[in-house]
Each structure stands twice: as structure tokens, then as C-alpha cells.
Amino acid sequence: MASFKGFSVNTVPVSKAKRDISSLAATPGIRSQPFTPSVDMSQSREFLTKAIEQGSMSIPYQHVNVPKVDRKVVSLVVRPFSSGAFSISGVISPAHAYLLDCLPQLEQAMAFVASPESFQASDVAKRFAIKPGMSLQDAITAFINFVSAMLKMTVTRQNFDVIVAEIERLASTSVSVRTEEAKVADEELMLFGLDHRGPQQLDISNAKGIMKAADIQATHDVHLAPGVGNIDPEIYNEGRFMFMQHKPLAADQSYFTLETADYFKIYPTYDEHDSRMADQKQSGLILCTKDEVLAEQTIFKLDAPDDKTVHLLDRDDDHVVARFTKVFIEDVAPGHHAAQRSGQRSVLDDLYANTQVVSITSAALKWVVKHGVSDGIVNRKNVKVCVGFDPLYTLSTHNGVSLCALLMDEKLSVLNSACRMTLRSLMKTGRDADAHRAFQRVLSQGYASLMCYYHPSRKLAYGEVLFLERSSDMVDGIKLQLDASRQCHECPVLQQKVVELEKQIIMQKSIQSDPTPMALQPLLSQLRELSSEVTRLQMELSRTQSLNAQLEADAKSAQACSLDMYLRHHTCINGHTKEDELLDAVRVAPDVRKEIMEKRGEVRRGWCERISKEAAAKCQTVIDDLTQMNGKQAREITELRESAENYEKQIAELVGTITQNQMTYQQELQALVAKNVELDTMNQRQAKSLRITPSLLSATPIDSVDGAADLIDFSVPTDEL
């Protein structure tokens, strides 16, 4: 299985709708069966969408086998107006699960759809008529197609009651004679072999056939394929045809904007600003055969990085102008054909679910036709099919366009019976050789001169400028016959006669085919009136119930809504966890609570910043003053420290001086004491010699003088010798 690279995700597998089991069990005509929850692919879709928006070049794709869901079997009774009632049963798909809530209205609407004679004998009403033997899902599909074709509306739960009323109104205003437009549409189907009843040929050998052919040629309001939603079928099919030819801008851009945008993100496009081919990042999908040569179908260089990837390279600088994922039709078409018959999902369904624009080669188209597996390959409402992958190749050769258009009209089983010769003509192998020779003539004109054909505005007429000599793709003998019929001058008179005769025949047939006895006609009229009255009352009851439920829901949510409004506009900075619990207690929705708490957090941060700024502004002056004072004090402290150091030096000098003086003083004092002691000794001697009393002599104090004790005692006689 190849990996996709950048497919746009616009159409994804429909998620299974959840249903209330208890309400379904109480619905009449439903047998209860076990319910299995469905697989939700929303996460995969979100992943792919984000990756594509970010320009991712490698998005892994995984095939998911969605398990079958056991749904309830529903039985409905359809009561046509002109025949007996019959029942249909089956399961309702998840996409139409809302119909389970309005089964009575569905039965009434199916009664009208099962009675095509109520709508002017319209061919559209006959084509989508509900018939006995249908399954419930087929009947619902027929009903949806009927509403889309007749009312140009899409069936939804919201407008279902309006659709039923419109069907009733349309049926009540009908007449028994069908309009000329419906006749012409029916006859055109027979003329071109597209009628489901088998191949028929319009006889134009007489005047009546010529008149019918002229009417068919003059009519332009015939739609063979219904549109999607409210898109007009002609606009829808014209858009598909333009995409098939690589002319997306020729389609109505009010309906095909997304597909056109994806187209120019995938296929080679000329960038007028850079004057070169754009470097495409998004990858496309090619359905091709294993034996065909893709390089012969493009003017660019073809590079294959691996078996599943193809790059188209610019011939000037080899940059990538387009990227494609190659899928072989032999690998997916047979499995898709078998899955369609078994009601399962195929690999091709998963491929188509991840892209809006797909390329398929002419060889792949011929392969699916040859092997009888072409149904559902190109006729997909969610995918726009482009024949070929190089726009210039398709526009210049038209190879495969007619075959693809034919496969879009009908299933292969119908084409094999009604358009066998056309298929044989389109399947001829000589067409590929002719296309190859025509494309070689394109390449001979030079690469640079062909760049203008890839301009997004598509200003030039593509192949019309390149191939004025190219012959027509087919020869239509019917067109010649219709042109010849214009020369008939009696056509208006014959046409009027034919119309009158047909009206008479239809009136006679309607009288002869009426199986109802005349005695039962009044009762049948009363029954129809009562049925219409019952339908009207049921619709009024449904509207009343819906209105009542809406009023109750509004009353219950009024208080909560008012509280939500108050909380959203209330300014608060309380972001505590307990506050979230209180909001949950008053039943505020989780998303609203989250929004409120985030808003409060932002307000709180804003106020914190504001308060911080104001406080900082007020404190800045004080801080500056304190800083200045601190600097002044620091200078004073420095000066005091210097003064203290000077004082300490002076003190040390003074201490040294004092110490020196003390030492000098002590020495001098000792010398004086010693002298006095010597004098005392001499006085003692003289006193003795003079016989003076010794007590009258004063002695020198020796104890008060340090070092006096060590002095020589002169009182002791010394030996002078």
C-alpha cells in the first residue's frame, strides 16, 4: 500500500452517528439487535488537515478496516395511491440515522414517491419510484434522489418536514398529462441509448420521428445525472466535464472552489511572478496500468524515486513541477468491484477519501472496461476525475476523455447493451497511436513556447491553438439527420398534430387502465383526504413537539447561559483551583470554565505587572536616597579609618618616645641615687670623724628607685689596697 503525500482532506469516511438505544427500542416496526459502537475517524482527519496546512510532504496513510456495525432492522409499510400496499425492511445507514426519529413522515413521503402518476407522469418520478422488492436502503436512496431531482433540495433532519410538505403540495397540484419537457427528456434517453429499458432507436423516416428529433435537439433542460446537494445538475455535470479535460477554471467557481484550489496545488502550474513553473509540494494520485509508459504522456522529465512515486521535473533546472503517487489499476479495481457487491469498503474507497482530484490514464480506463470492473471508478461525487496527469497532453490529444465521459453516464452493464458500438470505437488501440503522434507534434514546437499553456488563468484555448487541423473525435450520424430535419417546412404543423394525438392516446390509456370501480371513487377520494389530513396533523404534532422540546431546553439553559455571560464579562483575578471546582459545581461547561480561568490568569498577570511597576516607581526615590547616604557614610568611614591609622602611628611614636625617656630617666635616676649613696657614705665617714650623731644625717631612699639595690654599699669598709 503506497503512502500518500499531501492529499487534501475535504471528504473523509462518514463517522458513525451515535443513537439512543432506548428510544430506538420503543419505535414501532423495529426489532432490537445488539449495538456496536462505531469507529471515529475525526482524529485522523484532523491529523491530515494539520499536516497539509503545514505543507508536509510525507503524510503516512494507513488502511483501517472499519468493523461492521450491527444495526436495527426497520420495517415500513408503503401505501401507493394506485396499487396495493407493500412492506420494505432493512437497516438504515448511520448517515441517515436521523430518519429513525421520523418514521411516520418517511412512510407518508414514500407513499408519494411510490406513486409516480401523482407527479404529472414525470420521467424523473418514474426513474426514482419506490417499488416492491426493494430493500430499505435502496428505497431511502431513491427517495433522496427523488427529492434532489424534483425539489432541488437536500434531505436533512432539519428540513425533513418541509420536504414532506413540498412533496404533498407538488402531488396535489399535478395533472394527469405529463409535460412536453418530460417527454423530450424520455425520448432523448432513448435516442442516445441511455434509457435503462434497453437499446431503442428513434425512427426518423416519417414526419413524427423528425418532429421528435427536432424537439430533442432544441431542448436544453435535460439532466441525466443528479447534482450534489443543492447544485443544479447541469452545473455539477458541466464542472465534472471541465475537470476531466483539465479546465477547472471553466467550472462554476461558486461550487468548485476547493477542488480548483487543490488542482492548482497538484498539477503543473506556471508561476507568472517567478516566470517559471511552480515548485509543487502537494502530491496527487495517478491510476495507471503496470505496462504503460508514463513518460510518453508529458512534456516534462519523469523521475521515479521509488516504485510508487512519480515526479515531473522542469527541463530547464530539474526542479519538481508535480508530484504523484502511482497506484496500479490492476491492484485496486478488481477488489473494489467485489467490495461494491458485498457492501464492504475497498482500498480504492480509502484512496478516494483522502483526495478531491484524481488522475486516471486512458490505458487504465480501457483496462477496467476490458475486464468489466469499471463501475464506481470514475463516477464518484466526492472526487473530480482528470484524464491524464499532464494538462497539455489531455488538452491536445483528448485521449480517454470520451471513454471517461461515457463511463460517468452509465454502468458498464448498460453500456454493453445500449452503447456497444460506441464502446468498441473508443476501445480501439489505434487511438493511442494517433494520440502519441499528435503529442509528438506538440513537443516539436519547443519546451519554452509551451509554458503558456500551464498558466493558471488559462487564457489560451489550449489545443484549439495547437491543432487547428485536428479532426473531430467522432462522427455523429444522428446530428446529420437532425440538421436535415430543420429543412422541413411542415414541422410546426406536424408537431402540433402529434401533440394532440398523443394527448388523446394518453387520456384513453388512463381511462382504460383505471382498475378502480366507479362506486369506490368517492371512498378513495375520502381516503386520500383523510390521509392528507393525518399527514398534516402528524406534521403539526411533530412541529409542536420540536418547539416544546426547544422551549424546555431554552428554559433549562437560560440560567446557565446568563451565568456564562456574567462570568465571561466579570473581571476577576481569582485563579485558585478551588474556584474551578466552584464553577463546575454550578454546572458551567468545561470549555467555558477553561476560557474563564485563562482570562482570569491573564488579568492576574496584568495586575501583577502593573502593581510591580507602580511599587518599583515609588520605592525608587527612597532607594536612591539611601544609596546616596550609604555612599556618603562609606566615605566617612573610610576617612575615619585613615585618621585612626594616623592616630595609631602617632601613638606608637609617642609610646616609643616615652619608653626612651623612661629608660633615660631611669638611668639618670640610678646615677643620681648612686651619687647620693656615695655622698651619704662620705657624710657618714665625716660624721664619724667629726663625731656627729648619725641620726642627724638623712639617708638616700633606695627602695623607691629601681636598680638601687644593686648599687655599691659605701658603708662597708673596703680594702683600698
UniProtKB/Swiss-Prot annotation:
GO CC term, one of those recorded: cytoplasmic viral factory
| Principal location listed in the UniProt entry | host cell
Q: Which UniProt keywords apply?
A: Coiled coil, Host cytoplasm, RNA-binding
* Location of the region described as RNA-binding in the Swiss-Prot/TrEMBL record: 1-38
Q: Which residues form a coiled coil?
A: 523-560, 628-686
User: What result is annotated for mutating H569Q?
Assistant: Diffusely localized in the cytoplasm
Top-level taxon of the source organism: Viruses
Q: Where is this site: Important for the formation of viral factories?
A: H570, C572
For this UniProt entry, the molecular function terms from Gene Ontology, in alphabetical order, are:
RNA binding
| Entry's family note | Belongs to the orthoreovirus mu-NS protein family.
Domains: what does the record tell us? Answer: The C-terminus is involved in the formation of factory-like inclusions.
Q: What is this protein called?
A: Protein mu-NS
Species of the source: Reovirus type 1 (strain Lang) (T1L)
Lineage per the UniProt record: Viruses, Riboviria, Orthornavirae, Duplornaviricota, Resentoviricetes
Report which gene this protein is encoded by. M3
